[in-house]
């Protein structure tokens, strides 16, 4: 179970970072980080 939880959190962080890159390249000014 611990391995599954770690894998799920890793996948969530990875997909979130991909989303940040995509939104950043879209030039949307609503989110400024």
Swiss-Prot record:
InterPro entries given in the database record: Cytochr_b6-f_cplx_su8_sf, Cytochrome_b6-f_cplx_su8
Compartment list: Cellular thylakoid membrane
GO cellular component, one term: plasma membrane-derived thylakoid membrane
Subunit comment: The 4 large subunits of the cytochrome b6-f complex are cytochrome b6, subunit IV (17 kDa polypeptide, PetD), cytochrome f and the Rieske protein, while the 4 small subunits are PetG, PetL, PetM and PetN. The complex functions as a dimer.
Entry GO MF terms: electron transporter, transferring electrons within cytochrome b6/f complex of photosystem II activity
Broad class of the protein's primary localization: membrane
Transmembrane segments: 2-22
Function in brief: Component of the cytochrome b6-f complex, which mediates electron transfer between photosystem II (PSII) and photosystem I (PSI), cyclic electron flow around PSI, and state transitions.
Membrane topology: Single-pass membrane protein
Keyword Transport: yes
Recorded superkingdom: Bacteria
Protein known as: Cytochrome b6-f complex subunit 8
SUPFAM superfamilies in UniProt: PetN subunit of the cytochrome b6f complex (SSF103451)
GO biological process: cytochrome complex assembly; photosynthesis
Similarity annotation: Belongs to the PetN family.
Species in which this protein is naturally found: Prochlorococcus marinus (strain MIT 9303)
Keywords: Electron transport, Membrane, Photosynthesis, Thylakoid, Transmembrane, Transmembrane helix, Transport
